[in-house]
Design a protein with these regions (language model features):
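Alpha-helical metal-binding/catalytic segments enriched in His/Glu/Asp
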Residues: 1-31, 152-157
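Short glycine/serine/threonine-rich phosphate/pyrophosphate-binding segments
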Residues: 3, 33-35, 114-115, 139
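Structural motif
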Residues: 4, 21-23, 47-50, 102-104, ...
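Short, hydrophobic alpha-helix immediately C-terminal to the catalytic nucleophile
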Residues: 7, 38, 116-119
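Alpha-helix C-terminal capping segments
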Residues: 11-15, 42-44, 119-124
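Acidic, glycine-rich active-site loops and adjacent beta-strand->loop/helix elements
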Residues: 25-33, 55-56, 134-136
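Metal-dependent peptidase/peptidase-like ectodomains
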Residues: 32-103
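Active-site-adjacent substrate-binding region
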Residues: 74-153, 158-174
């Protein structure tokens, strides 16, 4: 799902004027050590890291309602591999609120995202993980909500278009 969203963001950015080079990378071996993210982020050396992933939809009986289907893209503030960059998270939340893009703040007690490797690569980069709530995660019948997927694509497109050198420096060094 993250790869599909990255491709759609690339399509949205095609022909648009912005100051950024956006790399959409489909990584491998995330579950066994973020290996693909380590090698690709070391090669790319990003100024800002954006991971597109999935998370558990907890909207089931007895679930903690951490992330629910149909309530927007998940903005990960913590997982076992990274505590998301507060300045970048605050910037993204501001973009979501201004553009009326639905979002949910979420966390993982176990497991991580490629953001965990990106934020430590080379000299480091402020990083954020956007996670799509999924019912029956890691199965052959996973279910996502189209509105959540659309929110993911919209916020990443908007984020890339909104960043310039001054904004990146402000986020990085605030």
């Amino acid at each position: 799902v993250g790869c599909a969203a990255a491709v759609e963001v690339l399509q949205n950015l095609q022909g648009e004027k912005h100051e950024n080079i956006y790399f959409g990378v489909g990584t491998v071996q995330e579950e066994v050590g973020l290996r693909g993210a380590k090698t690709s982020s070391h090669k790319i050396q990003p100024d800002i890291g954006i991971a597109l992933d999935t998370t558990i939809a907890y909207d089931f009986p007895g679930g903690d309602k951490n992330t629910e289907l149909g309530k927007g893209v998940g903005i990960m503030f913590k997982d076992s591999s990274m505590i998301g960059h507060k300045g970048l998270r605050d910037y993204v939340i501001g973009l979501c609120e201004k553009a009326k893009i639905p979002y949910q703040l979420t966390f993982l007690e176990r497991g991580g995202t490629d953001g965990g490797a990106i934020h430590m690569s080379h000299i480091g980069a402020p990083s954020i993980s956007f996670c799509l709530p999924v019912r029956y995660l890691h199965s052959h019948t996973s279910i996502v909500h189209q509105d959540d997927y659309d929110a993911m694509v919209k916020i990443v497109t908007l984020l890339v278009k909104s960043l310039d050198k001054d904004t990146v420096n402000k986020i990085t060094y605030q």
